[in-house]
């Protein structure tokens, strides 16, 4: 099967095009840093495989995700490249295009966001550009799918009759050096003359990954030639001279291809940014938007829908299942397991799906509109005080959905110590798995202020992340403040299709977890409540679950929720935070009183908020721990990522409850 790779600058629509060409769905957002590892999909019509590579501005990598690109181009086999460029930012995008053309591999250029360019008054004669580059160009709008069907039909012809042709003349002295380098590379390695020229050019540009691909003897010979030409070039470095020549080539290439409107025209994005990124009013606007989202999620839309679903699962559905099992003569043990264990456990989590969907819809709306990138800029000013840059806030925002992709997104951070710090604080972000816990307790104890209480927990998670990052960056991960440079995407009206797919994929992951982790956890919790030292079908106070819960309940007694029931829910919470709710449903619903009544009797508003603080901050779930181990390559850092949140959660919850108890 033929392999094709898709390449481009960050946030030019690579993943949108990938989804359109493969029919799959990968996470997209109107901001940079979404793709941090290569993703493989099967092209429609069995054309071949398409590999979506992380966005990069240059083939000389400075971050872990950019390393993936250069490594793939040098070491993997592929039939051609699809270079997607932003038509509204063509001059900057062509910088990467030129480097890819120097590979002298079959290439198609996808001219994306042609609609945005047109709205800005930018006119591009892509036919003329195609003739100049001698490379096929396909105008597309990846977000809507316009032009992608034609591109798909042409991909199978990519490389047919291809003859390497692209070459920039870097001047007599540098070209002579490139020629000598090529001879060494072809003699000492298996690369052909075209690959050798690309390697020589990248070596002269100080691409360290290229140097790492060669043996030390070849590197020494090439370094000697580079030093010689550096003396010949004079005061200007070889790299700077080559970049000057390349920039001149690009300007000449585009001068009669692209026509720009009046430069004095101020775009809509710029006018809006003056308000949304304002250093004084930008943050209050962000908090107000988040309050509106939570108000909609927990008061206006989400909760009423959840109540209806809860009534259906706990009433009609459960009664129907009981009737069917009685008719079939199912033994009492299985009946209890299914109704009191599986339906009670899994159902207690599924009732929050409407709230999850509403929340994900609005987060997807903020992402696709381009607003999320502005939040990173806004937070950069604050995060400098805590030893981080705004680039760390991008993975943190992703953590509102799930902490696992949040940790993986830290690959886009160039500075290794800042990347590691971001990984260690990312689990403090309130992921969707914690939301059912919040929803359950705010619905019982804080009915009039549900959105404000949940917002306070999200803000608390961010504050704790900042405080911990301060400690880390001043002690074991000392680091100079990094400069944060980010491209602000154009504001756009999100498409209904994109919003629906994004919301559905996120919600689907939540439901899928209900069918795996939560299902398994519910069965185990119910069995532990069913079995005890004295046999089976024991009173829950004589069960193994009571024994385990009593031990942990004793440990958290100073935190305000030291019952055996609360203690028993904390252990399976390591598996997945949603299991906390399913465990409560099984434990608290085992008696005559309902779940809500029992929680009201065993918690107060103060202890309920203390419990939510503890759930927010304590041990990350097992999937997050696995992601931390994968990204840090260290059991030491993984152990720290498990231990310090537990200590932090205990200390902060203890202080909150004990101080609050003095006033309540």
From Swiss-Prot:
GTP binds at residues 112-115, 141-143. It comes from the Bacteria. Pfam families: FeoB_C (PF07664), FeoB_Cyto (PF17910), FeoB_N (PF02421), Gate (PF07670). Its main location: membrane. The keyword Cytoplasm does not apply. GTP 2 binds at residues 33-37. It is found in: Cell membrane. The chain crosses the membrane at residues 281-301, 342-362, 382-402, 425-445, 452-472, 516-536, 544-564, 567-587, 608-628, 637-657. One of its GO terms (molecular function) is GTP binding. InterPro entries: Fe2_transport_prot-B, Fe2_transport_prot_B_C, FeoB_Cyto, FeoB_GTPase, G_FEOB_dom, Gate_dom, P-loop_NTPase. Residues 1-161 form the FeoB-type G domain. It is a multi-pass membrane protein. Probable transporter of a GTP-driven Fe(2+) uptake system. NCBIfam families: feoB. This is Fe(2+) transporter FeoB. It comes from Staphylococcus aureus (strain N315).
């Amino acid at each position: 099967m033929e392999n094709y790779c898709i390449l481009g600058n960050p946030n030019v629509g690579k993943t949108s095009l990938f989804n359109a060409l493969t029919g799959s769905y990968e996470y997209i957002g109107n901001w940079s840093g979404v793709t941090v590892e290569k993703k493989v999909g099967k092209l429609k019509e069995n054309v071949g495989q398409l590999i979506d590579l992380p966005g990069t501005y240059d083939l000389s990598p400075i971050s872990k995700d950019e390393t993936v690109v250069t490594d793939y181009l040098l070491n993997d086999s592929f039939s051609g490249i699809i270079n997607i460029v932003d038509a509204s930012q063509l001059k900057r995008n062509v910088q990467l295009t030129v480097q890819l053309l120097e590979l002298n591999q079959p290439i198609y250029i996808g001219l994306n966001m042609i609609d945005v360019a047109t709205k800005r008054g930018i006119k591009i004669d892509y036919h003329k550009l195609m003739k100049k580059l001698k490379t096929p160009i396909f105008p597309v709008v990846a977000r809507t799918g316009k032009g992608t069907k034609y591109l798909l039909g042409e991909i199978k012809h990519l490389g047919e009759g291809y003859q390497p042709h692209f070459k920039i003349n870097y001047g007599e002295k540098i070209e002579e050096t490139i020629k000598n380098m090529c001879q060494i590379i072809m003699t000492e390695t298996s690369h052909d003359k075209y690959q050798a020229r690309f390697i020589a050019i990248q070596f002269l540009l100080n691409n360290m990954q290229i140097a790492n691909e060669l043996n030390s003897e070849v590197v020494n010979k090439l370094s000697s030639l580079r030093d010689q030409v550096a003396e010949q070039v004079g005061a200007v470095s070889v790299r700077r001279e080559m970049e000057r020549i390349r920039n001149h080539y690009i300007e000449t290439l585009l001068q009669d291809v692209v026509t720009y409107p009046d430069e004095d025209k101020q775009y809509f994005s710029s006018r809006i940014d003056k308000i949304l990124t304002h250093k004084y009013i930008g943050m209050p606007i962000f908090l107000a938007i988040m309050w509106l989202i939570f108000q909609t999620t927990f008061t206006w839309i989400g909760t009423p829908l959840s109540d209806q679903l809860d009534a259906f699962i706990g009433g009609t559905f459960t009664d129907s299942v009981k009737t069917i099992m009685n008719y079939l003569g199912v033994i009492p043990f299985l009946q209890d397991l299914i109704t009191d264990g599986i339906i009670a456990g899994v159902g207690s989590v599924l009732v929050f799906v409407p709230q999850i969907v509403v929340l994900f819809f609005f987060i997807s709306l903020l992402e696709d509109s381009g607003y999320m990138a502005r939040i990173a800029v806004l937070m950069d000013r604050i995060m400098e005080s805590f030893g981080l840059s705004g680039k760390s806030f991008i993975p943190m925002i992703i953590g509102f959905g799930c902490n696992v992709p949040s940790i993986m997104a830290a690959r886009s951070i160039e500075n290794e110590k800042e990347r590691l710090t971001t990984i260690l604080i990312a689990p403090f972000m309130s992921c969707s798995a914690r939301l059912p816990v919040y929803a359950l307790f705010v619905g019982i104890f804080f009915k009039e202020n549900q959105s404000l209480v949940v917002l306070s927990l999200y803000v608390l998670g961010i504050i704790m992340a900042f405080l911990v990052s301060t400690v880390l960056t001043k002690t074991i991960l000392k680091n100079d403040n990094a400069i944060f440079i980010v491209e602000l995407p154009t504001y756009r009206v999100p498409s209904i299709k994109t919003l629906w797919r994004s919301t559905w994929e996120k919600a689907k992951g939540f439901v899928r977890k209900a069918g795996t982790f939560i299902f398994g956890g519910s069965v185990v919790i119910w069995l532990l409540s069913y079995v005890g030292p004295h046999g089976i079908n024991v009173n829950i106070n004589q069960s193994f679950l009571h024994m385990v819960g009593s031990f942990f309940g004793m440990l958290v007694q100073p935190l305000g929720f030291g019952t055996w029931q609360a203690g028993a829910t904390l252990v399976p919470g390591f598996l997945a935070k949603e299991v906390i709710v399913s465990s409560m449903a099984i434990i608290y619903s085992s008696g005559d009183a309902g779940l809500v009544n029992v929680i009201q009797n065993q918690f107060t508003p103060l202890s309920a908020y203390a419990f939510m603080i503890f759930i927010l901050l304590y041990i990350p779930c097992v999937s997050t721990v696995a992601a931390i181990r994968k990204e840090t390559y260290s059991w030491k850092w993984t152990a720290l990522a498990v231990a310090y949140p537990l200590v932090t959660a205990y200390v902060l919850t203890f202080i909150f409850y004990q101080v609050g108890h003095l006033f309540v």
